[in-house]
Amino acid sequence: MYLNTISPSRGSKHLSKRVGRGIGSGLGKTGGRGHKGQKSRSGGKVRLGFEGGQTPLYRRLPKFGFISRKAMVTQEIRLSDLSRVSDKVIDLNVLKTYNIISRKIKFVKIIMSGEIKRPITIRKLRVSKGARAAIQSIGGQIEE
């Protein structure tokens, strides 16, 4: 066997159909598109959700819900995330400087997930009941 004799196995490669190249090819003239109509034209596609002029499903159903603007600037952080902070007092700006939260976040709630090893002081952040108990049990404080 030589490199110049290697070829793909029979039937593993499909040749692309050459359309519009004469009657004998079987794909001449209309090129497999049929006669007339929107789909036979160049660029002839119907938009997504179009139902032929019938009121489409997305307009037949009522509107619902909304996107809370406050949710975009609110974040929950785990108790274990606070172990990355070396400061004794933790507030919103400290969390931003340690890249625990992004700059756009304005409201933070600390939730009970993971554990914390050293006493810390939480200032002006919301804290869940479980996280509050965990922080206070090791001698930490929560200032409102």
Swiss-Prot record:
This is Large ribosomal subunit protein uL15. Residues 1-10 have a biased composition (Polar residues). GO terms for molecular function: rRNA binding; structural constituent of ribosome. One of its GO terms (biological process) is translation. Residues 11-20, 32-44 have a biased composition (Basic residues). Disulfide bonds: none annotated. Part of the 50S ribosomal subunit. Keywords: Ribonucleoprotein, Ribosomal protein, RNA-binding, rRNA-binding. PANTHER family: 50S RIBOSOMAL PROTEIN L15, LARGE RIBOSOMAL SUBUNIT PROTEIN UL15M. Belongs to the universal ribosomal protein uL15 family. Residues 21-31 have a biased composition (Gly residues). Residues 1-51 are annotated as: Disordered. Pfam families: Ribosomal_L27A (PF00828). Binds to the 23S rRNA. One of its GO terms (cellular component) is cytosolic large ribosomal subunit.
